[in-house]
Regions:
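Short hydrophobic beta-strand that contains or immediately precedes a catalytic carboxylate
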Residues: 64-67
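Active-site-adjacent structural elements in enzyme catalytic domains
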Residues: 69-71
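Surface-exposed, charge/polar-rich loops and edge strands
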Residues: 2-46, 50-57, 61-62, 76-206
């Protein structure tokens, strides 16, 4: 006989959460903030009760976030103090170097900067407030909402799309006219060059 274990849910101060990536899309954060702000206190509580933040326990029992960085940043900026986390793995017995190596090999971190360049683990911010804006990550989020690709379970799939767009659409063009850049992104997403990306939903034959 096997016993199914329920995930352990713990309230944690948002300011204490540790990122496992360097960037977020600040447009995505703004959308999360709007969503939170538009709800009543009761609805916000219900939302937070169904959107637990997954974490890995690291050295000193610190909570390292493996998903929902945009939500965590939005909560921080909206002044919401605590969020429920679900611990997916306890690696608190490891030293710092071993811990980050495990995160990296398990696909639980994304140490790439706003230019798509891989950085040393020390470049990962220690707080959600220090996450850097990557406009191409915002484009990837909007692209998925517009049907450019399907939601996928591949870790950090939106960052793969962000890097695809980064190599093809000029950053100044994105800053100058986001909507126009999105039209180009939507067209690119259906092409064969994007066929290797998770959630690709372009034509499979000519």
């Amino acid at each position: 006989m096997t016993t199914q274990r329920e995930p352990l849910l713990n309230p944690v101060a948002v300011s204490d959460l540790r990122p496992t990536q360097i960037t977020v899309g600040m447009r995505e954060v703004a959308l999360k903030r709007q969503m939170i702000r538009s709800q009543t206190a009761r609805k916000t509580g219900t939302f937070l009760g169904t959107h637990m933040v997954p974490v890995v326990l690291g050295p000193k029992k610190r909570n390292y976030v493996t998903d929902h960085h945009h939500l965590a940043r939005a909560l921080l900026e909206e002044g919401i103090r605590d969020v429920l986390v679900t611990v997916i793995s306890d690696l608190s017995g490891l030293d710092k170097d071993a811990f980050f190596n495990v995160l990296d090999n398990r696909g639980w971190m994304h140490p790439f900067d706003e230019n798509g360049k891989r950085r040393d683990y020390d470049a990962i911010p220690k707080t959600m407030a220090e996450l850097v804006d990557d406009p191409y990550r915002s484009m990837a989020g909007e692209l998925r909402r517009q049907g450019g690709f399907a939601k996928d379970t591949t870790p950090f799939s939106e960052f793969l799309w962000a890097d695809f767009l980064r190599r093809r659409i000029d950053r100044d063009a994105v800053a100058k006219n986001f909507d126009k850049a999105m039209k180009e992104a939507l067209s690119l997403s259906k092409g064969k060059d994007a066929g290797y990306l998770p959630g690709w939903c372009g034509p499979t034959s000519d």
